[in-house]
Amino acid sequence: MGKVAAKIKVMPDSPDIDLDELQERLEQSLPEGAKINGFERDDVAFGLVALLPTVIVPDDAGGTEAVEESFGDVTGVESVAVENVGRI
């Protein structure tokens, strides 16, 4: 079974949120078998900055769904969207 790299856009619920703390909470929320291979930050608007973690997950049924759900449950996250997916 191969692996998939997915860039996921995580929007915080406030421009005042501490992005370093949010990044740490996202790392701790990962389901088993998934790992983060780096973060990018994207200035959206009005001081709001999105986090863009690249997540490596096994290439099986469900794909990034478990990661999206776990990120969505993290305190301070407004929305989660997959931006890009590719096999590695």
From Swiss-Prot:
* Record flagged with keyword Phosphoprotein: no
InterPro entries in the record: eEF-1beta-like_sf, EF1B_bsu/dsu_GNE, Transl_elong_EF1B/ribsomal_bS6, Transl_elong_EF1B_B_arc
Question: Which GO MF term does the entry hold, naming one?
Answer: translation elongation factor activity
* Source species, domain of life: Archaea
> Which SUPFAM superfamilies does this entry report, sorted A to Z?
eEF-1beta-like
Q: Name one Pfam family in it.
A: EF1_GNE
Sorted alphabetically, which keywords does the UniProt record give? Elongation factor, Protein biosynthesis
Q: Does the keyword Protein biosynthesis apply?
A: yes
Q: In which family does this protein belong, per the annotation? A: Belongs to the EF-1-beta/EF-1-delta family.
Which HAMAP family does the record associate with it? EF1_beta
Q: What does the UniProt function comment say about this protein?
A: Promotes the exchange of GDP for GTP in EF-1-alpha/GDP, thus allowing the regeneration of EF-1-alpha/GTP that could then be used to form the ternary complex EF-1-alpha/GTP/AAtRNA.
Name the UniProt record assigns to this protein:
Elongation factor 1-beta
